């Protein structure tokens, strides 16, 4: 699979580039169409908040879909990542307006941790960001990127 960022929604456990932030914007309350800034500190491995910004200003990624994991016992990060990959990749084309495999954007996601799961967090947050990790200056919705 192409490079990806995997984070968790209450305490972010990250693979790839980190997704931590220091604003008062809760990771658990993201909305489709929100644009976010990734932290300057690339060594960060946890997050409970994300810096949100206007999509017309420089930003690192955009929320393009939300999904929910089924209730029950915590399924583990591997199972949640499989679900997130399926959900996010299937929603990518319709939101961005281009095929995921040929897009200049990558799909990344945030998933619940065991701790956030215990607080009823079932959110899977799908993010689009440039493959080269450059900044975006507009929404990726129907952009064809």
What are these regions (language model features)?
Residues 3-7, 22-145:
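Primary mode marks residue(s) on the alpha4-beta5-alpha5 output face of response regulator receiver
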Residues 11-13:
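Repetitive helical segments and hydrophobic/amphipathic motifs
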